[in-house]
């Protein structure tokens, strides 16, 4: 019996590759995030920095079953939309297909006749791009995670200061 090591024949890309989609004479650049890549904010951020007009997430959520995993996974796409001010189109083979606008609002969701996301089927959507964000980079897209690091540093300093004050009182 042979075991294939994790990541056996996968080679990471060296640059962001965007797909072009021409609609009505306009060309839209699409940043593709495969499955759980939407969990990693830096991947979406680099696509936006490279000129992506929207993100497309193709995902296999079938292994979650009909639990909350598909909705929790979709929440990451909401974060990516807000962080980068780009719409996100999601296509899941086992739940949660739809689109999220650049403000993080779920604008359309593929549901069956019973109102559930867990079924086989398909649909089409019209995605709106808000002009005020079109081709502009959000603060997060331009500057990244420095605010998170700064907040973590301030929280750590506050904790150490508080512990020091407790030690002085005792």
Give the positions of each predicted feature.
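Enzyme catalytic cores with a strong preference for nitrogen-chemistry domains
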Residues: 1-170
């Amino acid at each position: 019996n042979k075991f294939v090591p994790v990541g056996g024949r996968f080679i990471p890309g060296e640059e962001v590759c965007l797909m072009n989609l021409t609609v009505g004479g306009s060309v839209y650049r699409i940043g593709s995030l495969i499955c759980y890549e939407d969990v990693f904010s830096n991947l979406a951020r680099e696509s936006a920095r490279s000129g992506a007009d929207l993100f497309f997430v193709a995902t296999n959520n079938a292994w979650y079953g009909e639990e909350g995993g598909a909705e929790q996974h979709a929440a990451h796409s909401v974060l990516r939309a807000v962080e980068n001010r780009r719409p996100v189109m999601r296509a899941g083979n086992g739940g949660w297909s739809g689109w999220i606008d650049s403000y993080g609002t779920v604008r359309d969701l593929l549901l069956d006749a019973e109102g559930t996301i867990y079924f086989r089927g398909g649909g089409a959507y019209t995605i709106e791009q808000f002009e005020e964000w079109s081709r502009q980079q959000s603060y997060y897209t331009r500057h990244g995670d420095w605010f998170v690091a700064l907040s973590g540093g301030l929280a750590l300093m506050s904790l150490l200061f508080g512990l020091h004050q407790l030690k002085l009182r005792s």
